[in-house]
Amino acid sequence: MNIKRAKEEIEHTVKAYLAKDALGEYAIPAIRQRPILLMGPPGIGKTQVMEQVARECGVALVAYTITHHTRQSAVGLPFIRQRHYGDKDVSVTEYTMSEIIASIYAKMEATGLSEGILFIDEINCVSETLAPTMLQFLQCKTFGNQAVPAGWVIVAAGNPPEYNKSVRDFDIVTLDRVRRMDIEPDLPVWKDYARAAHIHSALLSYLELHPQNFYQINADVDGTQFVTARGWEDLSNLLDTYEQLGLQADEDLIKEYIQHPKIAEDFSAYLDLYYKYRDDYGVEEILAGQAKPAVFARLLQAPFDERLSLVSLLLAGLNTRFAASRQADAVADACYAFLRETKKALATLPDDLPDGSAELFSQQVADYDAETQRQREAGLLSRDGLNTRLQVQAELRRWEGELRRANAAGTQEAFELLRGQFQTLAEDREKAQQTASAALEAAFDFMEQAFAESQEMVVFVTELTVNPVSHAFLTENGCERYFQYNKDLLLDHRKAALQQELAAEQRRHGGM
């Protein structure tokens, strides 16, 4: 299965394993809660999936790479204890708590979450001394004499033997106690994730043209050459930061992430062209509605991959604006909700209490900061979610400063001041939405003049539809031309499907 399907199955499993009956007991007894065993090539996204599932299910996550552990840290350290059995005093060996089990309790204490996921990576690559412990863990859900706490779902991951020489096969007794999922690389599924994760547009455009270069692991006389989904994502993060700093990514740098020389060389050459197209065509000028006439003449002679790269650049510029608009929306919505709670709280204060409004607001802001920190430590915030809360914190702190400087005479005056601050924020949100909408209209003007209803327009409209950032913006704010083109595309798809059905029916009748 692909990683998206595996994520859905793990999410459903967590919900099922943590479901309780009318008496408050787990509906599926712990002994029947089979651990999940994910088997797949390295760098496919197994660890990230666990982070997403934990965040979306609202549970804690404790993750370990078991190859970093010795038997002592996994099982615990031995010590001697005196026992009295029958009429004899004897010395027996006991063990301290496993470091892994202890980390679960530490996570519960730090986050306040009593339920979670224990994720053990590279479980089939352990040393010979630790192998029996891992078998016991999968079969009995214990490390040494310490059981995994109730309410914690066990997920383990490993690599097939063709990817790792250290792999140990599990026997049938162990496999009969786990739920095994075999995961394969899937570019279309990864692209869905990549759009939501804001993966660099150059990578997505390149992989659209060269899908065979998404994931490869090849062994030859020179060693192992490979490129993985993890490599592409990590490179994307670096490229984003390099662009912000005005730094140039060269071929040597790319080879540090894409450890397949031919693919690294190919992508490096494409990236240089990608940046060249951005500058030559003036993407920002196009989105400002100021496309140069020479651009249209050049496109008439341009090969398809160049035209497709330009479409990708336009989409990247739009998505930056859509994301800014969405972020402004999220911050404004959160501040509005906060302001409503402040209004309720202010109504409970005596109007003549000195500095009462400022003190109350400061306490509310401090509580918001503490909740952000709690969710951050618990791993319950996505990257976008964390950015939103941090921006809200900064905005609220600014309001707090304005409120203290104003020295409001009463609660009503304090609230009016805060409402004025929010109005400025609402105006900023409106500007961000207008900027994005204007750029979208300019992009459609350019696309219609340059490509009309060609394949490039199909790609443009399709990407606007499938990208969650653009889709959310269009759903909220609309765009008449987008909806018209999207409707025409759907009609064309239905017509093509009907023609295929008719052709198949004719072939069947012709064969009779």
Language-model segments: what does each one mean?
Residues 300-512:
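Terminal-proximal interaction/regulatory segments of ATP-powered molecular machines
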